[in-house]
């Protein structure tokens, strides 16, 4: 090959090498707790920010923080908490999803030095400061569980949308004010009301501009991943996070320990061998089911049933979402022979009757559960009742056994 030919081929070779590297890396960019830093992960299950985490721990030690107890979670896998000491005060390093780093500081601890030393590496949360903007509505039950309703100052939903009576009453009495939905918050109301923290669900990741705006206004943002846990007790353990944040640690830990024992008792319920399909229908009658590793299938198993889609996974390997969209044809192949159907109505509302269900799609009429009259829908408050998981499982066991549910499920006639 001539020198001239080699010179012309080099750019193409270089571009091919770059393309190959990018293809093999399969990198995705995920935000850390700060506003500018990013970490990279090769696979969705890979450890996120491991090297950065080690550097952070080393930096904490260098800056005079003495590491104490790391709490051993009983079931939860999406958060960790470690105690630290500085100036005689106890602080808590909360790590969520391996890359969101929060330092929870006592109300009387000066955070100026920490903010200067760590910048975007840590999100600072002042413990028990109140005026929390709760935009992750499923977490309301955790505040109820640890007696921390008074720490909520703002809500992303209106009183009528709360199933938790204490929150509904607090909003009616103007103790908690509506401050806009998570995707369009009332920034002026939040700043005027001195919001101390925004607690968001992972939906905020679809509106990154909102998160950035809150941070620029000086409102720290914490993203909750409790619904990504694979068992009800793991999801319930997140009450500890909210107990620490609000200064109600003892109440939270005591509540979890008591409820965990109740769930352990529930695990002894009789196994029936009956199959259960748990799903929802959107406005276009598309079917949404839970992946086999989600906490809902785990609850069905504890209730004595067998989940109809135990091996189902999200086809998007980059997604952590526990929900999977199915074509009706694919859903029908499995669901037509299931013994029991449970329809999640927390988003789209009540189906009302079997005839209304079959009107949505005539193929429902050919399904065993429909023919046998074993179709149920969830109550509106089930999504906001993570702190009552043991009661939900017991209620689920009742309907699997052919008995009437006490609260959380209603048979369609």
What are these model-predicted stretches?
Residues 176-188, 313-329:
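Short helix-initiation/N-cap motifs at beta->coil->alpha
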Residues 48-53, 229-258, 337-413:
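Structured C-terminal subdomain patch of bacterial secreted/periplasmic proteins
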Residues 92-193, 197-204:
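A short, structured surface patch at a secondary-structure boundary
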Residues 296-320, 342-345:
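His/Asp/Glu-enriched short active-site or ligand-binding loop at hydrolase and phosphoryl-transfer sites
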Residues 28-36:
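Bacterial lipoprotein signal-peptidase II cleavage site
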Residues 131-144, 245, 249-305:
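Basic- and aromatic-lined ligand-binding clefts that recognize polyanionic substrates
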Residues 24-26:
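C-terminal motif of bacterial Sec signal peptides marking the signal peptidase cleavage site
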Residues 36-72:
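Short Lys/Arg-enriched alpha/beta "domain-start" segment
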């Amino acid at each position: 090959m001539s020198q001239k030919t080699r010179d012309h081929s080099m750019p193409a070779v270089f571009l091919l090498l770059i393309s190959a590297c990018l293809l093999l890396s399969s990198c995705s960019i995920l935000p850390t707790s700060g506003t500018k830093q990013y970490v990279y992960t090769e696979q969705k299950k890979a450890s996120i920010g491991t090297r950065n985490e080690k550097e952070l721990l080393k930096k904490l030690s260098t800056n005079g923080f003495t590491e104490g107890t790391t709490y051993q979670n009983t079931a939860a896998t999406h958060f960790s908490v470690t105690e630290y000491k500085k100036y005689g005060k106890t602080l808590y390093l909360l790590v969520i999803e391996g890359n969101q780093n929060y330092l929870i500081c006592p109300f009387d601890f000066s955070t100026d030095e920490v903010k200067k030393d760590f910048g975007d590496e840590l999100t600072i949360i002042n413990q028990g400061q109140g005026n929390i903007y709760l935009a992750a509505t499923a977490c309301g039950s955790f505040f109820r569980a640890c007696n921390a309703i008074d720490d909520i100052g703002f809500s992303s939903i209106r009183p009528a949308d709360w199933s938790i009576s204490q929150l509904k009453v607090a909003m009616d009495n103007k103790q908690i004010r509506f401050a806009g939905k998570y995707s369009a918050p009332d920034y002026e109301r939040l700043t005027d009301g001195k919001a101390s923290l925004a607690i968001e669900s992972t939906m905020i990741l679809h509106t990154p501009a909102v998160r950035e705006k809150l941070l620029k206004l000086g409102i720290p943002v914490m993203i909750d991943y409790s619904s990504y846990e694979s068992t009800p007790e793991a999801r319930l353990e997140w009450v500890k996070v909210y107990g620490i944040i609000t200064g109600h640690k003892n109440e939270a830990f005591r509540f979890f320990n008591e409820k965990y024992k109740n769930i352990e008792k529930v695990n002894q319920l009789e196994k029936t061998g009956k199959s259960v399909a748990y799903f929802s229908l959107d406005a276009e009658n598309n079917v949404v089911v839970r992946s086999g590793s989600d906490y809902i299938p785990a609850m069905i198993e504890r209730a004595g049933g067998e989940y109809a889609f135990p091996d189902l996974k999200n086809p998007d390997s980059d997604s952590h979402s526990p929900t999977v969209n199915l074509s009706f044809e694919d859903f029908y192949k499995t669901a037509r022979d299931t013994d029991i159907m449970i329809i999640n109505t927390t988003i789209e509302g009540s189906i009302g009757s079997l005839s209304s269900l079959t009107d949505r799609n005539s193929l429902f009429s050919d399904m065993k559960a429909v023919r046998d009259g074993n179709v149920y829908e969830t109550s509106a408050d089930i999504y906001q009742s993570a702190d009552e998981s043991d009661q939900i499982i017991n209620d689920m066991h009742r309907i699997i056994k052919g008995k009437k549910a006490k609260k959380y499920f209603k048979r369609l006639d």
